[in-house]
Amino acid sequence: MGPMKVLLVMLVVMVAAPHIADARSQPGPTCPSSVQAILCDNRCGRSACSYYIERCACCAKCNRIPYYGASNHPGR
């Protein structure tokens, strides 16, 4: 039974390892969507944020609602 347990543990680690690596490579807050993040980035000014993760922070700092269409324009 000993060797079987070792093999089972190794199998679990091998399956889980890629998922753990993916989670580590994407630190910081998660955006609702990349489109929303980019729109917020444009509203704040492109120079404010250069990376995807920083765009999320930029959107939060900017405190602006993402623009999705003409329906958001008053008087139209």
From Swiss-Prot:
Q: List the disulfide bonds.
A: 31-62, 40-58, 44-56, 49-59
Q: Which family does it belong to?
A: Belongs to the paralithocin family.
Please report the PTM annotation for this entry. The amidated form is probably the active form.
Q: Which UniProt keywords apply?
A: Amidation, Antibiotic, Antimicrobial, Disulfide bond, Signal
The Gene Ontology biological process annotation of the record reads: defense response to Gram-positive bacterium; killing of cells of another organism
Query: Has UniProt tagged this entry with the keyword Signal?
Result: yes
- Keyword Disulfide bond listed? The answer is yes
Functional description taken from the UniProt entry: Has antibacterial activity, mainly against marine Gram-positive bacteria like C.maltaromaticum (MIC=25 uM), C.mobile (MIC=12.5 uM), C.divergens (MIC=25 uM) and C.funditum (MIC=12.5 uM) but also against C.glutamicum (MIC=12.5 uM). Has very little or no activity against Gram-negative bacteria.
N-terminal signal peptide: 1-23
Please name the taxonomic classification of the source: Eukaryota, Metazoa, Ecdysozoa, Arthropoda, Crustacea
Listed name of the protein: Paralithocin 3
Q: Which residues carry this modification: Proline amide?
A: 74
